[in-house]
């Protein structure tokens, strides 16, 4: 659905660097699952139905941003201060 090479470009990770490929694939799958569970609608490449959503560029960018956040922040993130 979202190709690994596109994720690597988004993250500015060299395509020849393969050490994180398995982890990035997990993040791709988790981002898609997060979208589907939040919206209660499965993502599809084509042929939408009453419930299935075609992955648009806007959805793809949102998923890439989520993957990027998870990749760069592997632990909990706190915004603001006390």
Predicted ranges, named:
Residues 1-82:
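Divalent metal-cofactor coordination and adjacent catalytic microenvironments
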